[in-house]
Amino acid sequence: MTQFASPVLHSLLDTDAYKLHMQQAVFHHYYDVQVAAEFRCRGDDLLGIYADAIREQVDAMQHLRLQEDEFQWLSGLPFFKPDYLNWLREFRYNPAQVCVTNDNGKLNIRLTGPWREVIMWEVPLLAVISELVHHYRSPNAGVDQALDALESKLVDFTALTANLDMSRFHLMDFGTRRRFSREVQQAIVKRLQQESWFVGTSNYDLARRLALTPMGTQAHEWFQAHQQISPDLATSQRAALAAWLNEYPDQLGIALTDCITMDAFLRDFGIEFASRYQGLRHDSGDPVAWGEKAIAHYEKLGIDPLTKTLVFSDNLDLPKAVELYRHFASRVQLSFGIGTRLTCDIPQVKPLNIVIKLVECNGKPVAKLSDSPGKTICHDKAFVRALRKAFDLPQVRKAS
């Protein structure tokens, strides 16, 4: 296979906002914590043939660094501290932390090292894999086809919402990790900027260059790592929620609910957390059932749901977002994060269902037991059983 002509990535900020938000919290609170993370392809794609090309891109990433204009822009945001930004200025990717192999056609990737550094690999590395694969599989597809597909979707969207009050509909681009390419994501976001309901992007590079609001708080790994950082497994989720508020007392307050199922999350999400966090993010399971549980929980605590925001981000497209908006708009604030269905929705192109997830923290297992059993990730079945017991989970979920 011929090698990709040039580096896929051009900016250290070409990543999701929550990576930097979490990295700052790790820098301040868990500087010496060590982790391991692994790549998973949830589909049947045999991606091992791209291992050498991916390795070449990983090696090229060591040359990325925070540029002065990027540093100044980050310094103007309200939640970053000078000590972290000065450290980030000196940060360089370390390719030695990444092991890429072709295992009889299956792509294996394992990341190891200090959490404060490893945390940065996931999103850009997935974006690299996605762009490389689509470059070889669909060499004739690109920006024009992506924009044509988007225009068709926007025509349908306009018809679908003709009789709706859309003043409280807020859409965000969450499409970095599985985008067709960097150029396609930028073109899609620039087109969506023309719509009044488009409010921002999770991509820090695009947010800076297009003067958009960067969107994101924390990911599953924040909660997973606390399973080993916290001295008591049963209180690890509460420890993660409290540590986040310690770093961000009154900002970035959308909590992810499905690291250990929504029901287990709500048992930990008492009046103090529910009052201080601005809202919740859905990332697995039935979205309507999840939203109803969230609203009922706020009401039970005496909190007006209209003062809180629910963010839906699981496998969304525009029609699904409208359906959820119709259901919930009068009862709670809403935002919708759409990823693959915006940045890799091109006819004849099959998006990759790929993830990189934490599997160890300080040499011990961690797990994600989401509201969609197929999204469960953990090597250690005994740890999964211990986690289920600690959080009183009612059903067995297969560890994959």
Curated annotation (Swiss-Prot):
InterPro entries: N/Namide_PRibTrfase, NAPRTase_N, Nic_PRibTrfase, Nic_PRibTrfase-Fam, Nicotinate_pribotase-like_C. Transiently phosphorylated on a His residue during the reaction cycle. Phosphorylation strongly increases the affinity for substrates and increases the rate of nicotinate D-ribonucleotide production. Dephosphorylation regenerates the low-affinity form of the enzyme, leading to product release. One of its GO terms (molecular function) is nicotinate phosphoribosyltransferase activity. It catalyses: nicotinate + 5-phospho-alpha-D-ribose 1-diphosphate + ATP + H2O = nicotinate beta-D-ribonucleotide + ADP + phosphate + diphosphate. The keyword Transmembrane does not apply. It is an enzyme of class 6 (ligase). The keyword Phosphoprotein applies. Keywords: Ligase, Phosphoprotein, Pyridine nucleotide biosynthesis. Its EC number is 6.3.4.21. The modification Phosphohistidine is found at residue 220. Pathway: Cofactor biosynthesis; NAD(+) biosynthesis; nicotinate D-ribonucleotide from nicotinate: step 1/1. GO terms for cellular component: cytosol. GO terms for biological process: NAD biosynthetic process via the salvage pathway. PANTHER family: NICOTINATE PHOSPHORIBOSYLTRANSFERASE. Catalyzes the synthesis of beta-nicotinate D-ribonucleotide from nicotinate and 5-phospho-D-ribose 1-phosphate at the expense of ATP. Belongs to the NAPRTase family. HAMAP family: NAPRTase (MF_00570). NCBIfam families: NAPRTase, PRK05321.1. This is Nicotinate phosphoribosyltransferase. It comes from Salmonella dublin (strain CT_02021853). The gene is pncB.
